[in-house]
Amino acid sequence: MHSPLQTQQPEQRCWPMTSTVSEIEEVLPDEDSDRTTLLNGEPLRRRVSGKSPVDEGPRRIFRQQSFGRDIGHAAAETYLITGLSFKLLRYLGVGYRWMTKLLALTCYAMLLMPGFLQVAYSYFFSKQVRRSIVYGDQPRNRLDLYLPSNNDGLKPVVVFVTGGAWIIGYKAWGSLLGMQLAERDIIVACLDYRNFPQGTISDMVTDASQGISFVCNNISAFGGDPNRIYLMGQSAGAHIAACALLEQATKELKGESISWTVSQIKAYFGLSGGYNLYKLVDHFHNRGLYRSIFLSIMEGEESFEKFSPEVRLKDPVVGKAASLLPPIILFHGSSDYSIPCDESKTFTDALQAVGAKAELVLYSGKTHTDLFLQDPLRGGKDELFDDIVSVIHAEDNDGLTKDSLAPPRKRLVPELLLKLAREISPF
């Protein structure tokens, strides 16, 4: 990679938290499981090799019950999202820009549909995907886990916060990344969180922080290494994750009660993120996310400073808390017009100015969707993917060896459709 940052092994281990354990047990058991852990007096199941024929009957019943729960949950979420969509339309009113974006988004999705269908099939039917694990008590406080196929030791973990303009984010948007990283022996936890108008930015940051806490305190029950947890966000998710990380560091500096610490995060990866709301509000307005909506999402202009990580670093207390942050690597395409790459440049400068370990990686000619969608769907070599994996496996010689021998990722969408999608992408 472009001189990847070296990270130190944190000394603090993650210990089990005491919430939503029954929900973990509902979704975790599979054909390769064994009772090994107790949280809050209830058994969890740790993934191990081997099967027990005696358990086949209960497992069959469980799978039937799990399918029923999935159907019920899907119906409930569909009803919820439909209602929120109509509420959002009332906020948006009639506007040329956002209607044009909606039409472009529809065409964009249709062009990439061959790849989306393949990913969706794996998402719903792969045994390596654990969907909708509850991590909190608020709506959409759920996460998806993408697990490697082998169980030879504890795996590094990526907590991923999806993008979606703070409005259309959903945990399944990270499914392609999750599946591809799982092929490299990396567990991925894709967080869902309340979007606008169901919640505003403070709700989103709270949800993300609670999801990170859940992973830190429970991932060992799923075969994850609690001392090798990486945080990643994309687009709006990068902004939300950065806010959560900086807020947690500030709380830690002040000695406040916390359920996870920034020292438990090995590194933060920010992909195509925006970190200064003052500079983004007019930019988004011109691209169809109208100023009135943006102000509603961000709880008014008076909250811009609080939710602008770049600006917050100017506060002496927050600047001091930045010394607690893990190494930060910001990735951005130089041709990103949705969120200009200057957002990552100036945030990197601000972090370095207060002594934080920060690095910027720019990809020449790449757009907002090239890095996260078109390139992964194209298959073969992918600079961003290789850069992320090289950091995660930097201290794992076996992992680096396996990476060098890994077969090229398969193409999911024909090149012609990818080029057309790039031209009409609304992002």
Curated annotation (Swiss-Prot):
Subcellular location, principal: endoplasmic reticulum
Gene: ICME
Substrates-to-products reaction catalysed: [protein]-C-terminal S-[(2E,6E)-farnesyl]-L-cysteine methyl ester + H2O = [protein]-C-terminal S-[(2E,6E)-farnesyl]-L-cysteine + methanol + H(+)
Molecular functions (GO terms): prenylcysteine methylesterase activity
Keyword ATP-binding in annotation: no
Further comment: Plants overexpressing ICME exhibit enhanced ABA inhibition of seed germination and ABA induction of stomatal closure. Plant silencing ICME exhibit a reduced ABA sensitivity in seed germination assays.
Name the record gives this protein: Isoprenylcysteine alpha-carbonyl methylesterase ICME
Gene3D superfamilies: alpha/beta hydrolase
Active site per database record: S235, D336, H368
Cited InterPro entries: AB_hydrolase_fold (IPR029058), BD-FAE-like_dom (IPR049492), Carboxylesterase_B_AS (IPR019826), GDXG_lipolytic_enzyme (IPR050300)
Localization (cell): Endoplasmic reticulum membrane; Golgi apparatus membrane
